[in-house]
């Protein structure tokens, strides 16, 4: 054995199973992804490069992501003292849009017009549109799968109209797994004005592990 795990049929089968469970093109599931934050960080560092804009359209993410993003503990867009190695330190520009003023009654809590306008203004510099499905520690509702996919549709639509590369639409799916009949990366037949998320990521410690898993995470989405 070379030690690289090449040809590990069990691992490959498990990855395919993860993709099948979430109805995605491809999947990656590992116990070496220690937590939800670790899993999200792996996905973010894998996609974002210096000069890219990461646009969160659900406001400030979990507090545990502030060091990954390079924000201070109040969410201000300035580096914190311990931000060395963060996405901001590496040249990634983090921006955020807040949800609509009354997200509990809005049919679509994401401020879609503001999101579309941001993409029109910054074009291909917007490498990622980021959605946190769960409410986290904020006073707002969790997003439904349809609400997320409608936002993904608008991102795809404006990108097509502008003739630019579509931003990666990524969803922090923690706490959202299996609470509906579909997931953000899959659009069921009959759905109107919806598009699948390119990437969803979450922790096995939460819903998928049934409260019994101590570690683990998954990243599923398009094969690209």
Q: Where do the protein language model's features map onto the residues?
A:
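Conserved PLP-enzyme active-site core in the AAT-like
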Residues: 5-8, 13, 17, 26-27, ...
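Metal-dependent phosphohydrolase cores
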Residues: 23
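N-terminal glycine-rich, Lys/His-bearing helix-loop that initiates the first secondary-structure elements
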Residues: 1
